[in-house]
A protein has these predicted regions:
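Short, small-residue-biased leader/transition segments that mark boundaries at the very start
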Residues: 1-8
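Short, isolated positions in well-ordered beta-strands
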Residues: 30-31
Length: 238
């Protein structure tokens, strides 16, 4: 016997009764409450010990009340996405970071402290060196990996949003990356630049807030607090 499965779903952004843009699943507003998931395992670093361990971890995420995982800096095996499909977990899929050695003062320290000033910095050719993408071969490698990633994972209904860049790590021409994604898959949302160096495109106004009180103004894109923190929970004996 040969079996198969299918899923019909629609993801969008639409205004609520007050005119505030909300994430929607099948035309109904949904509060996305999730975790930043880098896919580490104590037994094998980036390699899970078993398929059962993957399923158990994802089931625990669901049991804890989360409905979203932002898969950060890693592409998982297909079975990981299969389990997310089955469990009804939404995945925001980051592209794997690349480029040359990062200028941490530019992409981490200054942007955290001077967010309002730095967010609108353009990611065009004059800044590619500061953003660690001065090499044409590096930019071509990113374009190839972007296309391969979308083509490999677009069959999974759990994938709800593509995230081409995170915090300026190897970022360049984010608008072009969004256009490439739209050409390959126009059924998902796109978070053009998670954190900073926002170019005004995609579907998400994506904020990383580690130090300041959160103040959100109405936007033409749906607002997401896609990272926050500096929060620790000390565990005795850990």
């Amino acid at each position: 016997l040969v079996g198969s499965e299918m899923c019909i779903r629609d993801r969008s952004c639409a205004p609520d009764a007050r005119g505030v843009l909300r994430f929607c699943l099948n035309d109904k507003p949904i509060l996305l409450n999730g975790l930043l998931d880098q896919g580490y395992w104590p037994e094998g670093l980036y390699t899970p010990p078993s398929d059962a361990a993957v399923e158990r971890e994802l089931s625990e995420v669901k049991a804890l009340g989360y409905n979203l995982l932002r898969k950060h800096a890693k592409i998982e095996p297909q079975r990981w996405y299969y389990h997310c499909d089955k469990l009804g977990l939404v995945v925001w899929q980051d592209m794997v970071n690349g480029g040359s050695k990062y200028n941490l003062w530019f992409v981490t320290y200054l942007t955290n402290v001077l967010q309002p000033l730095m967010r609108r910095l353009p990611d065009k050719a004059p800044l590619w060196g500061l953003l660690s993408r001065s090499s044409e071969s590096s930019r071509e490698e990113y374009r190839r990996e972007l296309e391969d990633t979308v083509q490999a994972l677009r069959c999974h209904p759990c994938v709800g949003c593509w995230v081409p860049f995170n915090e300026g790590w190897g970022q360049y021409d984010a608008a072009g990356a969004v256009q490439t994604i739209r050409t390959l898959d126009d059924t998902r949302l796109v978070d053009e630049a998670s954190g900073w160096y926002d170019q005004g495109g995609g579907d998400v106004y994506s904020l990383h807030n580690y130090f300041y009180p959160l103040r959100v103004r109405p936007q033409t894109r749906t607002v997401a607090l896609s990272e926050y923190g500096g929060i620790a929970w000390p565990m005795p004996g850990h």
